[in-house]
């Protein structure tokens, strides 16, 4: 199987969500998903809103990133999760 890199966009529920605490929760979830975290950063959008992006490395698997997206979406402070890019490592 091939190794893939995936960039995932995570939107918090509001601008008041503590970014650093949310990043820690994201790391905890990803560590349980058998993936390597290659990047975790935030990007300001507008009016105090921001998106958090993570870049992960994983072995190609059935279902792709969907199980990871679902696990991240279960975090209380997360509004939405979307895989924005996937490529071979």
From Swiss-Prot:
Keywords: Elongation factor, Protein biosynthesis. This is Elongation factor 1-beta. Belongs to the EF-1-beta/EF-1-delta family. The gene is ef1b. GO terms for molecular function: translation elongation factor activity. It holds the Pfam family EF1_GNE. It comes from the Archaea. InterPro entries: eEF-1beta-like_sf (IPR036219), EF1B_bsu/dsu_GNE (IPR014038), Transl_elong_EF1B/ribsomal_bS6 (IPR014717), Transl_elong_EF1B_B_arc (IPR004542). SMART domains: EF1_GNE. It comes from Methanocaldococcus jannaschii (strain ATCC 43067 / DSM 2661 / JAL-1 / JCM 10045 / NBRC 100440) (Methanococcus jannaschii). Promotes the exchange of GDP for GTP in EF-1-alpha/GDP, thus allowing the regeneration of EF-1-alpha/GTP that could then be used to form the ternary complex EF-1-alpha/GTP/AAtRNA. HAMAP family: EF1_beta. PANTHER family: ELONGATION FACTOR 1-BETA.
